[in-house]
Amino acid sequence: MGKKETIGIILITLVLFVWMYFNTPKHPPQPPHPKSATEHSIDSTAAPSASKGGVTEPKLMGREEAASSVDTSALRIYGKVFAPLASGTEKTITIKTSLYKAVLTTEGGMIKDWTLTKYTTWRGQPVELVNYKHKGDYSLLFQSMDGKLIDTKNLFFTTSVPGGSVIDLKNGQTYTLSFALNVDPKDSSYIAREFTFKGGRYDFDSRVVMRNMQGYIANYEYQVTWEHGLNYTEENSVDESSSSTAYAYSGGETISLEASKSGESVKQQVSGNTNWVAQTTKYFTAAIVPLGKPADGAYLHGIDKPLPNNGQEREYYTALEMRYEGQPTQIDSFMVYVGPMDYNILKSYHIGLEDIVGLGWKWVIRPIAEYVMLPAFEFIHSFIPNYGLVIVIFSIILKLLLNPLTVSSMKSMRKMQALQPMMEEIKEKYKEDQQKMNQAIMNLYKEYKINPMGGCLPMFLQLPILYALWAIFRSNIVLRQSDFIWWIKDLSIPDTILRLPFTIPIVGMNQVSGLALLMAITMFIQQKMSVKDPRQQFMIYFMPVMFWVLFNNFPAGLNLYYFVFNLLSIGQQYFLNKKPMEEMLVKATDKKKSQKPQRPSRPVMGNRSMRRS
């Protein structure tokens, strides 16, 4: 759970406790290389043939001839071995599926563009996830024998597929595309990258093939990286950045890294077997998963950067640290997922990827959201296509389930109001002795079987449910851009009805949410109906205003739920208020009397035969 969500939850809890009291850098730096870890066996599967997009060994000019034609700056950066590969002609190949369009480039042998076809940005444009400010992403990083840090994104690969090719994949079809980086034709040393795309799926398989690279890679290690984050897709960059995080899964635990302060640069080295790394925006993710064997570790780096107009952006670097065995041939396999943070899709991989979906605190809120709320939402949605109606019906169902608690709370508050005259008499009688006053009031509660916390405890018990709903409405991509009625066009963000020409400090309020306002109005009406104590009149006004300000920046779905819940509570309160307070006291007294044990009657000893003579 992000910092913003945590602060929100703390504020809600503090407000409710008050209520209870009154009622009672641009490019991230290159990462350091880890120390050697436990060795793993190598998958010896052969590379696909060139006729099927497999690895080829292109013929280049000799090493001495190539080095002499390279400018000195390339030699200084990449060294004599890799400098000749820093120039070339770019070719691109496009892969089209029903879910995305991917553009791959020979410059870096990596992904240049990844556009989702079923999602649009807040501007209505297709979602492009690969950071367009850079050449592309998903590259390799290692140190050469002459101490140069080699990032393959800056080197030119070759492929047998003609440049400009477009491959259309139907659902269920696969296609393998290979790129080769010929390091030295004399000893047939090369690095090959293979991509196997699958129609109808957001993930693709990838292989790194290293042939005769023993004399070129130092430290027996290399990294598989996603270096430049993901493009933002939502209107509010501050809100989206608060959900942007880098993750690694190691030792059965999901490790997260957040660059939560403006201008902050944070990093984390993960040691030991690592099953995946991922980075997220609010609704989308890029994850790299080693297949066959875990990675030796991971490296996470993040930087928070301010944007114009008080905007904010977090850019992350995630890398798997792989062991290079120094064998003549090494093949490492990966699965890469680039797509929506759909809980059900991520969970279907059975590797814990669903942990990156922000569903609240692991031990308290998340189980409620994950195993109760989400299944309930999906079940209702299987019958009703509109998520706004799903929320309304869900609110009604939840109100019915919580009805015993709600009725108990309302009755307790009514009885407390009915006892006010007696309590005033006690306070007047014992105004000089606080201890006797408190004891007399507690005896009064005991006599009428009233729990002084009865009006507050049910609301407190509902807090985990409210937090779980907040997490779902904020992070569930199925609600993204889901409209309801009238002005409510997106249930996952605030339903703005008015833009303010200024921003209110501290709370960051620069717009007015219609549903938050309706929620506050219904809360005021309910408070007005239920609170009669003159000393609590301040709370009648304070609580709705406080909740309006707090909920103003919350998702419309959460405010819709709370609004409907309040409407139903107003109806309950109306019918309860129709009963006179005196009647409630009488009923409490009668119940007390009816529970008193009756004195048993004496047996009638009228039979003469039973008498003593």
Per-segment meaning from a language model:
Residues 1-43, 104, 198-199, 206-211, ...:
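Helix-loop-helix
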